[in-house]
Each structure stands twice: as C-alpha cells, then as structure tokens.
Amino acid sequence: RKAWHILNRMENVGGDLNAYTNKEETVVYSAFLTEHLERALELLGDIVFHSTFPQHEIEKETEVIIDEIQSYEDNPSELIFDDFEDMIFRNHPLGRNILGKPELLRSFRTEDVLSFTRRYYQPGNMVFFVQGQYDFKKIIRLAEKYLSDIPAAEVNNHRVPPPLYVPEHLTIAKDTHQAHVMIGSRGYNAYDDKRTALYLLNNVLGGPGMNSKLNVALRERRGLVYNVESNLTSYTDTGAFCIYFGTDVEDMDTCLKLTYKELKRMRDTKMTSSQLAAAKKQLIGQIGVASDNFENNALGMAKTYLH
C-alpha cells in the first residue's frame, strides 16, 4: 500500500496516525474512536513491520526533513539546546541532533533504512501499549492477528558510555536582537534514586510555574526576559540539566549574575518544611493535569514499560 492509502484509512474515520523520534526511542501511535481499534492496530502493524521504503519516497521525505532542519536553524532559541547537548556529550551519539545533517540524509538508500528497521524493530525491543475502554482479551486477539508474524531476534542496545564531562564555554556570534544563553551540566540517569529529588528542585528553580524562582527574579521583578526555564532530561545511562533564557544583549550579564545568585541561594539555603510541602503539592498538581492528556499519559506509561 502507498503511504497515502494508509494515512487516508485513518483520516477517513477521524483518527490520528503519527510518529516521532527522540534520542532513545521511536514512537508510532494512533488516536481513534473505540470502534476503530482493529483498523488502527492493522495499520500500525503494517507501518512498523512491513514498510518497504521505496527510494523515491525516501528522497521526497529527505527534502521535507531538510526544510525542517533549515527552519530549525533559523530559530536560535531551539538550536541552542542542540549546541548544549553537543558540548556536554562531546563525540557521543547523545550529542548528535535528532534531525541529522542534509548530506547524510541524502546518502540514505532503501537498504540502509531496511537494515536499520530489521535490526532494531524487534518484539524484544518494543512495547505495545493500548489505553482506552477495551476488553483485554480482544486486545490480545488482535495483537496475535496483526503482530504475530514478526520474527524475533536478539537486540543489543548497549552503547558506549559518554566520555568524562569536561566543562566548556561556547559563544556563537549571530545577527539577532536577543542573546540566547544556556547554562548546564550532566544530570542523573533515569534509574538514579536522586533523580526525583532533582526534578522537584528543578521545578522550584525554573519549572513551568510562573512562580519559579528564576521567573520571579528575571521576569516578574525586573522584566529582563520573556522566557526563562530550567530543564532536566534523564536518559537510560546519563542525564542533562540546563537553564535557558533569552534577553537583550545589554542585559545578558545582569541575567547571568541573577541566575547564579539563585543557584547559590538554592545550594546554601535549606528549604523549610512548608516550602518543601508546597513544592511537592505544585509538582503533584502539574503531573495530575498533564495526565489528563491521554496522549501524554499513554506515551509516558509506554516509555516506563520499555525501560
């Protein structure tokens, strides 16, 4: 079947069929009405395990991705995140940006893509996750019908650990109105017991709440930035912590001083029991609201099962 035929089969019943990649997973997913479960599973199985990747389709999609790369490179507030991970994971796969380079994309042939999918798209390397009002026995029956012909093979997902972290400072000159700044370091991996505590501290420091310490210090009190945030990313074997803000060039040094001041205060000042309780309450509330989104909920649980 042509790609359009597959997409149209889902669109015709108001469903959504999509995919995305990050640095450790590829996700193919669908959202649909309960009555279209079998149609969705049949299409997903066909896409993941039976795609043929004709060369003309690869070449067409390559140009789409190159357009995306060019658009991305025009946005320094996004590009800086890739530059940051390239620095802290220097000469390591985690330091490479997900979209890749145009010259590499144009070199791909059908057999390259098929070889990759045969190697990694294996039952032992995947999870199949369904969320909704379904009978479990029906799910098993349909999975056996559409997914049972997949040959199993041993998959080695081991990668070389990132090299020892060496602090760096990088300045990239660009003709923009704003200075885009990122400060960060390595963080905890997804299995580290200290990760949850760091997520809580990160939320207090520069999480999505308007009352985060950095947002109050840089935006609410002084109006120096439009956006300031801190982020913690946990991979299976390492992690990354970063603070980002965009500001006028003349305000950059002031913002840096204020940021370091908040970091020092957080390091040196113990949270009171009431502050800790409030921080936990806020994070629990944010998790609860995010869980109301079925897509976030399903993808989050599937990732938990995978790792």
Segments predicted by a language model, with ranges:
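Short glycine/proline-enriched turns and hinge-like loops at secondary-structure junctions
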Residues: K194-T196
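Active-site SXXK
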Residues: R1
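Flexible, small-/acidic-enriched active-site or ligand-binding loops
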Residues: P167-E168
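Charge-rich, well-structured scaffold segments of protease-associated domains
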Residues: H5-P161, T171-I172, T176, V181, ...
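Phosphate-proximal small/polar/acidic motifs at interfaces that engage nucleotide phosphates
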Residues: N215
